[in-house]
């Protein structure tokens, strides 16, 4: 049973959302009284309540989404609120839809999107993974964090070839290492206010760390927002090489450590926006003619299911005319389709840039 103190907090949070007329989050949009009453007295086997899901969105009324899953079970137990939010964000992924099985496809059909090197500064492909048998951040114990770090760092030690590198735990990190990782844009900081409010930063920095290969083209974040964020990147537009590296790494880790996957939702993540393939394939690209009008740039990108962000990612501005453009869709398509969608859209946008007056 959910205790009275939690129920009181839930009622207060619900009222705060209802009263916030300028709040535009998906949480506010779909958490009506009926849905709230259906969910407020439920608790997952690990003890997570609706409050754990919504407290960040209640505290931060400027959230875009406003909800997180404290553990895997939350997605099914609190389906009355998660399902409509997932359907809205992932553009029509209905409660009856099923995410397709994992398929990285034929890598040979992936190309260098900018062989001339004129437009694309760098290319990144990342995915998120959760370790099977462990909840997400708010429900993890200090011992869980250490145990997970031990398991993944042992696997890092077996990496060979271009994946070979070094693991840097955040605990006890010296200033010189820290500065080097900041200069490389590899270091992640303790979570922002959205993650803090979701209780995603407990026992910091225990169990958190960064692995990168010697060439600095492959990176794993351990226990940041998700258990694992696996990132492959390099200068230029050679999407094929970058995607191949990511696939090799994911397969290597998965052969030794099972990931948390749901038949309907695909790979499970802390935030519902990353479910499914969890893949975000992006380029840092300068398209000076198309970018003269940012609204127009966004409209063109949207035609190809692509999303435009500032140079440093979400909530940032463009620096030197360089934008971060990525695939928007993560659910209801395969990993291969997600990457191919980004590739095809960028190829078209470069053609349009070249044809522009």
Swiss-Prot record:
It catalyses: L-arginine + ATP = N(omega)-phospho-L-arginine + ADP + H(+). Its EC number is 2.7.3.3. It is an enzyme of class 2 (transferase). GO terms for cellular component: extracellular space. Catalyzes the reversible transfer of high energy ATP gamma-phosphate group to L-arginine. Residues 119-356 form the Phosphagen kinase C-terminal domain. Keywords: ATP-binding, Kinase, Nucleotide-binding, Transferase. GO terms for molecular function: arginine kinase activity; ATP binding; creatine kinase activity. This is Arginine kinase. Belongs to the ATP:guanido phosphotransferase family.
């Amino acid at each position: 049973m959910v205790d009275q103190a939690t129920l009181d907090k839930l009622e207060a949070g619900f009222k705060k959302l209802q009263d916030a007329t300028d709040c535009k989050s998906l949480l506010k949009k779909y958490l009506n009284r009926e849905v709230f009453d259906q969910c407020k007295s439920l608790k997952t086997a690990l003890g997570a309540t609706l409050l754990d899901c919504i407290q960040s969105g209640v505290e931060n009324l400027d959230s875009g989404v406003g909800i997180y899953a404290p553990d895997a079970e939350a997605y099914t137990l609190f389906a009355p609120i998660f399902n409509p939010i997932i359907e809205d964000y992932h553009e029509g992924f209905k409660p009856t839809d099923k995410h397709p099985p994992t398929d990285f496809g034929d890598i040979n059909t992936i190309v260098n999107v900018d062989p001339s090197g004129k437009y694309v500064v760098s290319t990144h492909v990342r995915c998120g993974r959760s370790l099977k048998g462990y909840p997400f951040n708010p429900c993890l114990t200090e011992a869980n964090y250490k145990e997970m770090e031990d398991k993944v760092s042992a696997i890092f030690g077996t990496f060979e070839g271009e994946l070979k590198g070094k693991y840097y735990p955040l605990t006890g990190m010296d200033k010189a290492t820290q500065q080097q990782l900041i200069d490389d844009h590899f270091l992640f900081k303790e979570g922002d206010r959205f993650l803090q409010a979701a209780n995603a930063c407990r026992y910091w920095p225990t169990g958190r760390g960064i692995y990168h290969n010697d060439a600095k083209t492959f990176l794993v974040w351990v226990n940041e927002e998700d258990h694992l964020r696996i990132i492959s990147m390099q200068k230029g537009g050679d999407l094929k090489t970058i995607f191949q590296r990511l696939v090799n790494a994911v397969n290597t880790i998965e052969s030794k450590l099972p990931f948390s996957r749901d038949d309907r939702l695909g790979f499970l993540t802390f935030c519902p926006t990353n479910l499914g393939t969890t893949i975000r394939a992006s380029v840092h690209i300068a398209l000076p003619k198309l970018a003269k009008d940012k609204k127009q740039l966004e409209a063109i990108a949207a035609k190809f299911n692509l999303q435009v962000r500032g140079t440093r990612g979400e909530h940032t501005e463009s620096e030197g005319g360089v934008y971060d453009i990525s695939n928007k869709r993560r659910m209801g398509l395969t990993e291969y389709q997600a990457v191919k969608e980004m590739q095809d859209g960028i190829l078209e946008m470069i053609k349009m840039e070249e044809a522009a007056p």
